[in-house]
Amino acid sequence: MYFQTLDDKAECVGIYANERLIFDADNFPAGIKNTWSYSPYLRGLDVEYASLYLEGQDVWDHIPEYLKDDWEDVNKRLVSFRRSLALSKVSRTENCFFDLVPERFLVDYCEVKNKITKHIFTTINKPKRYDFYKHISMMLGDIQSREISIDRRLVTSLKKNPKLKNQAENILTCDPCVRYKQFGTKTGRLSTHKNTFPILTLNRSFRRAILPTNDFFVEIDFNGA
């Protein structure tokens, strides 16, 4: 059974399946099997992820002609909703996305994405490294769901340094989590999405602004050279 997730945060449980929106994991249909990408509340379920079949390729290059107009339409609406939320200063990190947009849009968006997901599964061979990709995707999804505690006062004080000003402003306005791009570089190294915490390019001066969730941090540097 094809289905789509409605949010990628662990606490925002929601899927679209059997032509209905479901917000309780206990009510997930038994036959859900194929979706676009991983969300933390899918851990433990035997699910296949179509996005991993592309191995970083642009999904637009694999959308059949008869679905391109529909996909473009729902994406324009998605961008409009995100822009409105940004202008209204509504945090998508602190709120579940499905609580911020009309249910009619969620249904329309998921219907189109289900069709694209099905097309990917039926036209592209499963990658030989799929199981590895899946484990990495799950790990990155779980990392993404962990909010980073930031000493905002310290970061603000570092804005006085011209060399640190831009990154300080980025840290103060970004989503307080790390969203990695699994296929972000040709070399296979990870990169991060824009508007999320810049963990890979963080200036050393900002390290003490990251507060531990428990007692302390342990920094481990793996050098592949």
Describe each region flagged by the PLM.
Residues 1-15, 22:
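N-terminal low-complexity regulatory segments of large eukaryotic nuclear proteins
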Residues 17-32, 37-52, 56, 63, ...:
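Acidic, glycine-rich two-metal-ion catalytic cores of nucleic acid-processing enzymes
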Residues 68, 75-78:
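Extended non-globular interaction regions in eukaryotic gene-expression and organellar proteins
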Residues 73, 87-89:
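Charged, often flexible domain-edge or linker segments that flank or initiate folded functional domains
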